Amino acid sequence: MARDLEALERRKAKVRRAIRAAANGRPRLSVHRTSKHIYAQIIDDAKGETLVAASSLEKDLRSSLKTGADVEAAKAIGKLVAERATAKGVTAVVFDRGAYIYHGRVKALAEGAREGGLQF
């Protein structure tokens, strides 16, 4: 168990280093997923503040989604976070997948954000 957690932290740190190198002042789109929900937030690391956030826990989305843990929910969250970001004037971000593999729900969220107008 401890080795698994160490491997997770190594993967997460490796991805975070790559993001810092490629960011060039752009905010990052951070993804967090659980077995029941998915969360996305756009963070400005220079200022240390969250600009935009969206999750499958929001009441207006919960009624329209079958569950918060599937690919359709992730795509909807991606589109929602992109809409909110463009409303605040953020169009270019760097994608932070964390320690998650770019597959399934994480990939769907990224595709939804691209469809919503974010560039990364």
Curated annotation (Swiss-Prot):
GO BP field: translation
Protein purpose: This is one of the proteins that bind and probably mediate the attachment of the 5S RNA into the large ribosomal subunit, where it forms part of the central protuberance.
GO cellular component: cytoplasm; ribonucleoprotein complex; ribosome
Organism: Azorhizobium caulinodans (strain ATCC 43989 / DSM 5975 / JCM 20966 / LMG 6465 / NBRC 14845 / NCIMB 13405 / ORS 571)
Keywords assigned: Ribonucleoprotein, Ribosomal protein, RNA-binding, rRNA-binding
Protein name: Large ribosomal subunit protein uL18
Subunit composition and interactions: Part of the 50S ribosomal subunit; part of the 5S rRNA/L5/L18/L25 subcomplex. Contacts the 5S and 23S rRNAs.
Molecular-function GO terms, alphabetical: 5S rRNA binding; structural constituent of ribosome
UniProt keyword Ligase present: no
Family to which the UniProt record says this protein belongs: Belongs to the universal ribosomal protein uL18 family.
InterPro entries: Ribosomal_uL18_bac-type, Ribosomal_uL18_bac/euk
